[in-house]
Amino acid sequence: HKIFYTGDINLSSQTLQPSAHLPEIKIDTLILESTYGATDSDLLLDWNSESLRFAKEANNILNNGGSILIPVFSLGKMQEILATIWLLMQKRKLTTVDIYTGGLGTKINRAYDYNRFTVRRVDEEFELSSIPQKDYYEISNPEEFFKHPCIVLASSGMMITSTSSFTFAKRWLKQKDSAIFTVGYMAEDTPGYVIANSERGDKIQLTSFDEPTEVNCAIKNFKFSAHARREDLVKIVDKLKPDNVILTHGDEEAFDWMGSSILKKYKNIKVQTAAIEKEIKIL
């Protein structure tokens, strides 16, 4: 009995990571992520189009003397966004400014470079270490970030309490010429979600322990996703034609869309949804 578990999967290439290759063998059970099962694909730009939208918004901030904070996950999103920013600068699509990185993300950058010939890459010759970067841990006074325009990539991606991005965000929120750009998913119970769903002039409270603060900076949200669109998820079923599909990593609405779409095309496929502590029988 052969099981294929997609994990987070994307059939489109990012800056570093190429599109996923699917197995050529017969699959009996497919465990399929459903992250964007409830999202209209017309709302999702491809990576290149979203990069150009990012560059346009970033130039508006940088060319007016502001700095940009981008909260990122240390693994994956940090490397993809860093490479995207650098290539936009090289193509003169994005104003060239200092890029600050630090912490675990920079260590993972080295792992990416070291293993670039042993895993699939869009360009295996490209090294993240070739990108000029400054270490934000070497900045003793955060006000240094606002003396000259710059871009800061800091974890955690959801601006969790006590992380670098959370600490920096408190400073950024006070800066009328600067901006916080979100580039990925924010869980509802995180400071990142509060910030991503606010706009200039709002009063927000990041945690129950923090005083309400006014949003003075710009807030811009981008979808640089490592997840496939829902139509592409169905295409995975089309290609593999499994006997069983187990839907994971999605909410009820996502499961409903995915399940009904699969069953409309394939009456003989058994579709189930995963849940914590739920036992699923496949044999």
What does each model-identified segment do?
Residues F54-P191, T248:
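Hard-cation-handling environments
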Residues T163-F168, W172, S225-K239:
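A short, acidic, amphipathic alpha-helical segment used as a generic capping/interface helix at domain edges
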Residues F4-I9, I31-T35, I70-F73, T101-G103, ...:
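Active-site neighborhood of phospho(di)ester-bond hydrolases with catalytic His/Asp-centered motifs
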Residues H1-S19, E143-F145, I151, G157, ...:
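Core dinuclear metal-dependent hydrolase active-site scaffold
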Residues H1-E80, T84-K93, D98:
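His/Asp/Glu-rich metal-coordinating catalytic cores
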Residues V237, K241-L247:
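Proline-aspartate-enriched helix->loop->beta-strand connector
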Residues Q205-K235:
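Generic long, charged, amphipathic alpha-helical segments
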Residues D256-I280:
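Short acidic, glycine/proline-enriched helix-loop-strand junctions
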